[in-house]
Amino acid sequence: SVTMGGDLNNNQPGFKLNWVKILPIAFSAMLFGDSLSKLYYATVCRISDKKAAKDLQSSYLQKAKALVLKSDRKAMLQLLASAVESFNSLLPKERLERKKVGIVGEIFLKFHSFANKNIASWLTEHDIEVLPPMLTPFFTQSFVNRDAKLQNNLLKSNIPDFVFSQ
């Protein structure tokens, strides 16, 4: 939709999300994705068969997708344990130290390979370990930001504080 004003007016009254229902599996999926990304990048720079790591990553993403659709958080944790074993089995016996590089910048650039000119692929092809950007801290930071904004009277909330308390 196109707007000339300062906000995007795209009201869709029939589209409602039950956050209480989807938040647990969404958070589990985000943690799984972050962990799988770390496993992939730590492995791919240390092995000669880069395709094996990519295939393994794709396989685990497909398996996780099925579990997300069933909202099976416990099975996702078991799948992650299996992924750790599988990625570890690809590694050589001797520990190979690699240079490490993190991808920083605007979130869109960090997560969009075309926007960042496929820098992660280039780095891994040159046996440099990519410290991938994580989605979990990006989203959990909003809880910290919320507290700071409330304390500084920059935000009013209709949501009870116990929802956000630890």
Residue ranges and their predicted role:
Residues 1-166:
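An N-terminal assembly and electron-transfer interface module characteristic of large anaerobic redox
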